[in-house]
Amino acid sequence: MSSVKVAVRVRPFNQREISNTSKCVLQVNGNTTTINGHSINKENFSFNFDHSYWSFARNDPHFITQKQVYEELGVEMLEHAFEGYNVCIFAYGQTGSGKSYTMMGKANDPDEMGIIPRLCNDLFARIDNNNDKDVQYSVEVSYMEIYCERVKDLLNPNSGGNLRVREHPLLGPYVDDLTKMAVCSYHDICNLMDEGNKARTVAATNMNSTSSRSHAVFTIVLTQKRHCADSNLDTEKHSKISLVDLAGSERANSTGAEGQRLKEGANINKSLTTLGLVISKLAEESTKKKKSNKGVIPYRDSVLTWLLRENLGGNSKTAMLAALSPADINFDETLSTLRYADRAKQIVCQAVVNEDPNAKLIRELNEEVIKLRHILKDKGIDVTDVQETPGKHKKGPKLPAHVHEQLEKLQESEKLMAEIGKTWEQKLIHTEEIRKQREEELRDMGLACAEDGTTLGVFSPKKLPHLVNLNEDPLMSECLIYYLKEGVTSVGRPEAEHRPDILLSGEAILELHCEFINEDGNVTLTMKPNASCYINGKQVTTPTVLHTGSRVILGEHHVFRYNDPQEARQSRHNLAAIAEQPIDWKYAQQELLDKQGIDLKADMEKKMLEMESQYRREKVELEQKMYHQTREYESMIENLQKQVDLAQSYISGGGSIWEGERMLTSSLLEFPEELKWTSDQKRVVLKAAIKWRYHQFTSVRDDLWGNAIFVKEANAISVELKKKVQFQFALLTDTMYSPLPPDLLPPGEDLTLRPYPKTVVAIQVQDLKNGATHYWSIEKLKQRLEAMRDMYETDAEMSPADGDPMMDALMGTDPFYDRFPWFRMVGRAFVYLNNLLHNVPLIHKVAVVNEKGEVKGYLKVAIEPVQKDEVINQKKGVRQTAKLHFRKEDFLKSHKNGETSDSDALAFPEHMQEEVEFCFRVVVLQAIDVADTYSDVFCQFNFLHRHDEAFSTEPMKNSKSPLTFEHTQNLHIKMSKTFLHYLHHFPIIFEVFGHFQPKSEQFNFERQNSALGRRLSTKLTFQQPSLVISTPVKSKKANAPIQNNNASVKSKHDLLVWFEICELANNGEYVPTIVDHAQGLPTHGIFLLHQGIQRRIKITICHEKGELKWKDCQELVVGRIRAGPEWAGGDDVDVLSLGLFPGTFMEFSMDDRTFFQFEAAWDSSLHNSPLLNRVSNYGDQIYMTLSAYMELDGCAQPAVVTKDLCLLIYARDSKISAASRFCRSLVGGISKSPEMNRVPGVYQLCLKDGSDSGSPGAIRRQRRVLDTSSAYVRGEENLGQWRPRGDSLIFEHQWELEKLTRLQQVERVRLFLRLRDRLKGKKNKGEARTPVSPCDPVCAIPESIKLDEKDKGIVGKVLGLIRRKIPMNKDPPTGNKAQELSDESGSNSITSPVSDKSLIKSSRSSDLLCRQKSKSDQNLASNDDIVDNLGGMKRSLSGSRILQLNILVPEVLEERVGVVVSKKGYMNFLEEKTQGWTRRWVIVRRPYILLFRDDRDLVIRGIINLANARIEHSEDQQAMVKVPNTFSVCTNQRGFLMQMMPGDEMYDWLYAINPLMAGQMKLHGNQNGTTLKSPTSSSSIAAS
């Protein structure tokens, strides 16, 4: 038994104590240490210790150095360790008292080394000086820290942050999975100690700049193995040296600890307090005389005391070193340390020599294992597969708690036995594996470790040849550089039997793929059998010497470049030549494909064509199938409806309900038999159905009447702004001479499926300033009209000096102008290729006709077959050659019932053979009688199916007539049924273009005769780009809303919508991002976002209480990311549907309006848009469109709220500077209030009657379209006699179509006449009989037809209708008088087809030109569909519905509040639903009154729609409310009493709100009791 040896050491003053002019309060006299408290009015205390070290001043003769401390404490403890005892040295004291300095010191300075380095040095010095060969020494070390009551392994980088502390009945407390390193020298210990010290937790406090924030325990296990030659047995002695560096106790007010430092200090004080309690308890136990009643010692209260249990009163020789601060400011801490040390002297330890503990432990552990196995076996548990790691058992039935505890003890014992039984060599191998693991982690971090283990860096090859990986995907690159060492470097897969040097993966890589042999400075590639290897794109099978810069491809995807530094230095000129083109992965792959003769582009194009063909074919099949099913279901519904109507009529006529139900039940089970129609009847019915299905007379008239007001308003604004642009209606029909452009067609309409041409109502835009004519759709006019209105509103506020007058036209922001092409089309002509069927050349002179049916000239074209043996002589002009491809799916659409087309029955002529190439030429000879107003005339031609670049001639100056082109185009085609079909039915299209240069007299004459031209001027103003109201973004979930502009409106509601974008803040909440309102854009603000932060979009809908009931938001979609305000159109490919949170209704105490708010999570990276992913550049703005599909109670479809938002992306960590925030606040752009960080939007919700919706035909039958051409438009008086065209335009266009039809017929007849004459001349030469026509007639014409009485009656009626003249509308509602048409044209409508009767009976290809556009092989393409429709009509007739459901259809329109401010200022409000007056800032922008909180408020808080409001002002009203200067505004939902502020004029406010009422009041002298309601006309004018 021995007591704990205690020593104290007094350190010098530190810098903090010197700066505080502290006094020394400690004195050391021998082994007595006295603390003097008189200087600070406290008592003196003296203590006796085993050693008292005075290290206060180096010049003091009693100064104790580091060496002396070690010689008196460390040497003795090291001697005990060699004797076989467990020893422990731990330092105790407050923070900054010198504990770490005494224990560790400075390892690099021999004089300043602490106890631990000196002890380790002497340990190996004694081991090295051992001369006894029978004794072997082994040393293991472990290093851990206790930080915040958690144990951390400082030597193993892969260990977790918290190791478990366990207790064994034989070994006592130990740390599970603590790394023990085997060391062989003092240098190894120093390295491990340095690694551990780097991982320790230190921090700076006010008392110590490098304060230890954890307890460190450095353990050395010394094993002495002695071999006894007599007994041939090995005995071992184990001793454990525990060197403890405790963290210092501290006070928070002294150290200034906060946050994490304060938490660390609390845990440090907790463990040290527990250590003090343990010392006190052990001292008490040691001084007790009776040992029977042994008290409880709180070892387990702290991890530190639990691990040091053996060193405190256990099996250990323990020394405690108390470090003291001599300063008077640390008097209390020093006195506490002295008292702890004094108590520790009384602790008695029972140290024993640990002789040969392994044998004893192994035996005891083995007995314990056998005992536990028997216990578990008796309980029926199989422990043969017990795992090493405790707690990880195989899945099975849940074990009881005591059984689980015994099983865990068994695992612990087996684990300890395995660890004890490890040999010294195994421990060294384990240490080496951990060292390699550490180097591997460094290598994964991109660092290379040298062999000495000290140098870190990346080494570049200077002499060694190497392979550079060129893979384009970094994740597939394995390694970037492979070094080719001297000798053989093998390449293969990781699973090979002999691991290769270079590991590659992939299907084409063999287990042993190839070898690189580096001998005599040359590298040779040797491949294994069946290995795929390529050098510079060429496959090699024999050993090949590599040269620097060579491209090596192994397998299919592994591409390398071989580099030899020595060879590169010898031939730098070769490298310079190679450097002209970058050698990368793409270069090597392209080189490989070139060497193999693979044209990757051609293969891709071929596959794309096949996929497109398959897609079109499957699409047509699905559409046909869907159409059939739809028609069947509609027919069944109509039949059932008919039966219900019959039953109801029976009941209403007096029949019983029971009989009516019986009739209904029986009739539902019976269907009338279908009528048996003959083939002639089917043909007649089919023709009539097709005609009426595509008849457009009434729909075209409705479009003219309904949109006349828009054309008139556009012209009025054009005159007011002096834009030199005139707008007028125009009818365009899709014919061969006038094909419709895609932008004039309804979206998704396919003209190829129509048997008759399509006629659309367009807007003819005459740009009189540039002499150009454009055609707009009605929708485009409406969009441009919005911008025209904005331009008109802002024109009065802009000065003539605002910008360059031509900037708006050049930028394309002026809504009146479109860009016009340099070349204008003169006209079109068509040439058929029937002469090629007879192998004769033919020269055509065809008319060039424009879309108005006017002949603009003639074109001379030659079509000549080229014979196989013909020698092509080079003539003057241009000669080109091209190869054509004709695909069957471009022309032949199979019928729905699988019927074959007529092209399958066509036979090839003798000079044409299937799948054999056929050659002919097209020669454009001359253009005749082209007007001299066109210069640079050229002609281009193409086939109907080709959408590629057309064949074009060179432009010719129009200086003389005729214009000679002499352009020859040789064409090669592989003969097929498709091309043969084309020769029979389709022509080549010729288009003549020229630069239009009107004569000045002609241009001026046109301007003077124009009703608008007389009022146009040259004044131009610069207009900022306006933002057209966007259409809703297409939803992926909700159905697209069906708009019915003709349905009756049930109610209208004004909506105020706030849009917010919230970003995730540091506190975990979503905060609205800043909005800049100073730009004045139609978006009402710019959101200033940060890059890469989670966001949410918050939308709040506000409106007056009423019948509107919001259910929830079905979907919120965001898309159309763009850099400019206008959306260019196209498919919404970047649309993202956001994840929604449930919507909630919000209530406010002083506001009884309805507030509905919902949020959606928005991840902007999913748009894959560079505009949202990167930081915005200076001056850039990002625009996007969002649409919220809202579900309303009682509505059949969602209401769509659409808004365009403007964004700016800032860096993630950037903040708006104070200067910038101040500058923006001056102009009112940014406010600190979060209520300002939202963007408002004003909308009008119209609820329409859903029963009006139905098929287009039903809508047209139900609606009454009013002629809006007579409606008044502001500025109409400036238009003079101009009026929008009306019904007369339809008849004029009908005559134009008649002209085009006759021109087409004439040209077709001329073709056949030329061909017949040419064939007749050819036959005369051969003395053969000339037939009547070039080919035989399709069918014989009967000489007589017999008719019965019924047929004669029908023929008589038809002849009567033909002879009857249809009366013309002499007085159309609007426009000029219709021209009187001839009797022949009066019977044809816009879509009336031309007669099917052939003009030349003997010709097979005498189809009409208008049918060729629709593909003659699918003449009447929808025959089956219409037959199904007729079948449905035969089965049942539609009846009235039983129940008309009152379903509403919502329509939301964004209202752009005008920029003209009529009046603004403060007003007092008294609402009927609230109490008390409220002061608000009011801005009148007709037709709205905008309400704000004050004049600094940037967000609209409320709106009043003057179009639906009534203004009242009277003296009686003011007398009743007893408040002067008041008037009332009443809406459908609310009434406001508004009072002006002192100093304001009543007339000014009334004039701003209702000018008509103010004018009447002024006229009548302020009559009392005046109550006026705003008329509709004034409201509409104000709104426009």
Curated annotation (Swiss-Prot):
Does the record bear Plastid in its keywords?
Answer: no
Q: Where is the composition biased (Polar residues)?
A: 1376-1394
Domain PH spans what residues? 1460-1558
Tissue expression, as annotated, is: Expressed in nerve ring, amphid commissure and ventral nerve cord (at protein level).
SMART domains (UniProt xref): FHA (SM00240), KISc (SM00129), PH (SM00233)
> When the coding gene is removed by deletion, what phenotypic consequences does the entry describe?
Worms exhibit uncoordinated and slow movement.
In this chain, the stretch annotated as Microtubule-binding covers 183-335
Concerning CDD domains, the annotation shows: FHA_KIF1 (cd22705), KISc_KIF1A_KIF1B (cd01365), PH_KIFIA_KIFIB (cd01233)
The annotated regions of Low complexity compositional bias extend over 1395-1409
Q: Which residues form a coiled coil?
A: 425-445, 598-652, 777-797
What's any GO biological process attached to this entry?
Answer: negative regulation of dense core granule transport
InterPro entries (alphabetical): FHA_dom, Kinesin-like, Kinesin-like_KIF1-typ, Kinesin_assoc, Kinesin_motor_CS, Kinesin_motor_dom, Kinesin_motor_dom_sf, P-loop_NTPase
- SS bond list: none
Q: Give the family, as the similarity comment puts it.
A: Belongs to the TRAFAC class myosin-kinesin ATPase superfamily. Kinesin family. Unc-104 subfamily.
Its recorded name reads Kinesin-like protein unc-104
Record organism: Caenorhabditis elegans
Q: What is the lineage of its organism?
A: Eukaryota, Metazoa, Ecdysozoa, Nematoda, Chromadorea
